[in-house]
């Protein structure tokens, strides 16, 4: 590194080398029906993440690598929703299903091995080294929402419910256990003042990095 200083070298070698890429693609089909429309969507998104760190991030010697993290998250989604407008009531309901794919290979040196002048180990190395055991699994759910405005559009009310299930967790197929109801109210007090209130309960499956961790 040009004009290297201890501070610059420390920053260079303490920060990992990160290489990421992502893509999203899909298509949708909309069909008009009486009082609304049906929307059908198919999509795929993927996120690839590589993180490496060496004792010397410029030389990048394999024998000096202290962190090697490679992961990829891919979701293939199919969504169907129906949207209606009847007598001022906006109604939406539908279902979604997706195939989740996750890969993770992790090597991390938490503590290096230390030896004395006689080559005896005085501090054993501590490392994390695993390949994620998480297999491809399904995620699916259904939802419904209804909303309307009253009093010359000054007051609005919205209510909804959804359930998210999966084929991975122990109780993942129990839709009643993952119900997420919510309700929201809004009232226009003046041109620039609106009072909002909402309450709900939300269920969310842990991220793939947690689901795919191995000790």
Predicted features along the sequence, with ranges:
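Face-selective signature of the C-terminal outer-membrane beta-barrel domain
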Residues: 1, 18-172
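Short, well-ordered alpha-helical packing segments
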Residues: 180-186
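Short glycine/proline- and charge-enriched loop/turn segments
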Residues: 5-11, 57-61, 122-124, 212-215
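Surface-exposed extracellular loop regions of Gram-negative outer-membrane beta-barrel proteins
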Residues: 2-8, 48-50, 187, 191-215
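Non-catalytic, glycine-rich low-complexity segments
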Residues: 13-17
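Exposed beta-sheet edge and beta->alpha loop/turn motif
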Residues: 176-177
């Amino acid at each position: 590194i040009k004009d290297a200083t201890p501070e610059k070298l420390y920053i260079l070698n303490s920060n990992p080398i990160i290489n990421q890429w992502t893509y999203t693609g899909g298509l949708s089909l909309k069909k008009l029906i009486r009082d609304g429309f049906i929307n059908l969507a198919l999509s795929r998104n993927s996120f690839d993440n590589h993180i490496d760190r060496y004792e010397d991030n410029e030389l990048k010697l394999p024998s000096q690598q202290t962190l090697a993290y490679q992961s990829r998250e891919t979701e293939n989604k199919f969504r169907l929703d129906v949207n209606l407008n009847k007598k001022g009531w906006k109604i939406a309901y539908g279902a979604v299903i997706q195939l989740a794919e996750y890969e993770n290979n992790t090597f991390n040196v938490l503590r290096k091995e230390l030896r004395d002048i006689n080559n005896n180990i005085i501090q054993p190395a501590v490392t994390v080294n695993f390949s994620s055991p998480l297999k491809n699994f399904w995620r699916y759910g259904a939802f419904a929402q209804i909303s309307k405005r009253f009093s010359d559009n000054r007051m609005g009310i919205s209510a909804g419910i959804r359930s998210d299930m999966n084929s991975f967790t122990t109780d993942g197929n129990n839709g009643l256990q993952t119900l997420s109801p919510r309700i929201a109210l809004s009232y226009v007090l003046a041109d620039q003042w609106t009072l909002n209130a909402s309450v709900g309960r939300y269920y969310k499956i842990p991220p793939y990095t947690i689901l795919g961790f191995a000790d």
